[in-house]
Amino acid sequence: FAAYPDLAGQSKSRFGLGVADALHLPFADDTFDRVICSEVLEHIPDYLATIEEILRVTKPGGRIGVSVPRYWPEKICWLLSADYHNEPGGHIRIFRANELEEDFTSRGFKKICHHWAHGLHSPYWWLRCLLGVKKDKVFGVRHYHKLLVAEMMKPNGLVATFGKLLDPIMGKSVVYYFD
């Protein structure tokens, strides 16, 4: 946790980690001020029930951050490889532009903003889909993955700058914030 001083021992912040069924979250109504659902909804058959659970555990006036794969980079992955979307536990849906926004705003939440993220990840997944989704040891794929991990762990320098430039053009994810 060295990279996150707010989680360090001297901090007064508290946090916990757990695993739960997204359709039956083990929390009382109105528990959290902030809720993050990142890269989950595309895996769940009844994603609307998951959204209802997210809304249930969010306090009135709370903020929700949610991300899903962006439509067109994800569609390319599906077109390049049947294995990509036929993997057990994998992506079973592609969200169209504004679909997720409507799913939240129709339930009373107000969109604060949205942005795109992971611009360097789209070409990585296209490469994986072209060469074989399970072939992650192939030289180019393996080294590209190392580059992505290095950029995520220390997001500075030329690679991070290039990634930020690519985010609005071909970011793999769309991120929404709602109040």
Where are these regions (language model features)?
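A short, basic/aromatic alpha-helical/loop segment that forms part
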Residues: I44, I94-F95, I169-G171
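A structural motif corresponding to the C-terminal end of an alpha-helix
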Residues: D103-F109
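A C-terminal cap/extension of S-adenosyl-L-methionine-dependent methyltransferases
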Residues: L79, H118-D179
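Conserved SAM-binding loop
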Residues: F1-C77, E99, Y176-D179
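Short, glycine-/aromatic-enriched active-site segment of Class I SAM-dependent methyltransferases
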Residues: V68-R93, E101-D103
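Conserved S-adenosyl-L-methionine
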Residues: F109-G119
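Residue-level signal for beta-strand positions within conserved beta-sheet cores that form or flank
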Residues: S11-S13, P88, K110
